[in-house]
Amino acid sequence: MIIDSKTTLPRHSLIHTIKLNSNKKYGPGDMTNGNQFIISKQEWATIGAYIQTGLGLPVNEQQLRTHVNLSQDISIPSDFSQLYDVYCSDKTSAEWWNKNLYPLIIKSANDIASYGFKVAGDPSIKKDGYFKKLQDELDNIVDNNSDDDAIAKAIKDFKARCGILIKEAKQYEEAAKNIVTSLDQFLHGDQKKLEGVINIQKRLKEVQTALNQAHGESSPAHKELLEKVKNLKTTLERTIKAEQDLEKKVEYSFLLGPLLGFVVYEILENTAVQHIKNQIDEIKKQLDSAQHDLDRDVKIIGMLNSINTDIDNLYSQGQEAIKVFQKLQGIWATIGAQIENLRTTSLQEVQDSDDADEIQIELEDASDAWLVVAQEARDFTLNAYSTNSRQNLPINVISDSCNCSTTNMTSNQYSNPTTNMTSNQYMISHEYTSLPNNFMLSRNSNLEYKCPENNFMIYWYNNSDWYNNSDWYNN
């Protein structure tokens, strides 16, 4: 799953570990390093390209001919059929990534963005977050020492709000755990039909070794041609040196890259060297007849070597990904435990001025940290969607202002966006400035909306949170 033999995924960690605000209580911990979120845009685009290449691998002879642009008159030896089975497994893995891992990773980023904006608020719509409301409820508890009813209500609201955040943190912890499990399946396979990258890697290397021996640079056929041309060159050089008045030209054109795919062109007019003319003609015939085979071998084995390099990269960086999502799982567990401790804070501790001030400061600092992480998570999600389907296209957003609860909508239900959105509304990202008249949306179980003809990217708004987000674009 690689673009070409010169393009490989960077060897450094696939997923960046994180150092911003890691000491903030109630904060996001190590979820970002300040300028990279989970996976950088460039790495995500590269992974997407690898996966798309994997989806297009040839699994029969006709597909192989199309893939490497071989005409029907060029024969393909039967031993190349070894590729089809291993490519089929690689293709299955790529399909599994798209169906299972890709949505989970996007969902994990959405979880972080959703939680971050929930606790920190969203300045773009002047919406207060849960931490600001917790601060207000703490003020009500401290400032209403003589009003038992007001204190009781503030405590009830405070604990209920903490309970919501604890519940979501546990859900997101479980989601990160599921990603770790899925990554392990992707890399090592399962008991069903997913073979696993490491097993594909092993089989691919075996096929690569066999085909390189039969058709690569060290194959007997290529060695024989190389030796003949080498001997011919020596003979020509010796003859030319002996005949100072000989006007000749020997041109070697290395057209086939790493293999000996050159053609010898000889201009011989002097009778002194006519005795080697037959040798030259014979070598030329052999080279001409072998050219198609050499071209075939270069293309197919070059593709094989490139994909083998890609598999190596995916496996090593997949292992790094497991470590990071294990860490993310631990971060969510810590966040849940910290807020659980906050929920069980005693009334006496809250009413103590020093303790109350300390909690207020901690919530304020954590809110600032969450806002940064939430914005980065949202940006990452948009980049991930755009690079997975169409790279380098601008994201324009159109939103409906209707309150629609159906799963299918037509273009006439859309108007200029509003800032106060309600549940069951939609936001659409695409490269056009208007929707076609016959536009129709359909929603799948992952809350992803598809329009196959135009490849629209859809973002779902529900329960006061965006499933995805972007800057508004007024149509």
Swiss-Prot record:
CC terms in the record's Gene Ontology section: extracellular region; host cell plasma membrane; membrane
Disulphide linkage map: 88-451, 402-404
Membrane is among the record's keywords: yes
Keywords assigned: Disulfide bond, Host cell membrane, Host membrane, Membrane, Secreted, Sporulation, Toxin, Virulence
Annotated localization: Secreted; Host cell membrane
Biological process per Gene Ontology, one example term: sporulation resulting in formation of a cellular spore
Keyword Membrane: yes
Domain of life of the source: Bacteria
Potential transmembrane region for insertion into the host cell membrane: region residues: 250-268
A GO term, aspect molecular function: toxin activity
Purpose: Pore-forming toxin with nematicidal activity. In infected C.elegans, induces an increase in intracellular Ca(2+) resulting in necrosis of host intestinal cells. Also, induces the expression of aspartic protease asp-1.
Family: Belongs to the cry6A endotoxin family.
Record's subunit section: Interacts with C.elegans aspartic protease asp-1; the interaction prevents Cry6Aa proteolysis by host gut proteases.
Protein name: Pesticidal crystal protein Cry6Aa
